[in-house]
Amino acid sequence: MIKLGFGSDKETQNVYNSLKNFAKKDMFSEYSITDFEENKDRNSFRFTIAYDEDYVYSYMVWYEAGILNIEPEKEDYVTEDIAFILYPIAEMLL
């Protein structure tokens, strides 16, 4: 699991919303985002990254108490997934 702290719940919520919007847009031709599902009551969303039929990875993202949590549903995630997840966060912080 990846845990990222941003100092305040408001900052964490902004990063969460940025990542959520990034995942919803499915902007990249190299892979597709499928099965996007948001749970507003729990400040969470789940999505799947599909590179091709053999490489499909699902993630759950949520925030609480100033911490953004990113949890893969499988233990064996790939570097590209981490880059995808951290890109909008890094862009926001620049």
Residue ranges, per PLM feature:
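Negatively charged, low-complexity tracts enriched in Asp/Glu with abundant Ser/Thr
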Residues: 1-44
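Acidic, low-complexity, intrinsically disordered interaction modules
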Residues: 28-80
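Ampiphathic alpha-helical segments that act as solvent-exposed interaction surfaces
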Residues: 15-19, 67-94
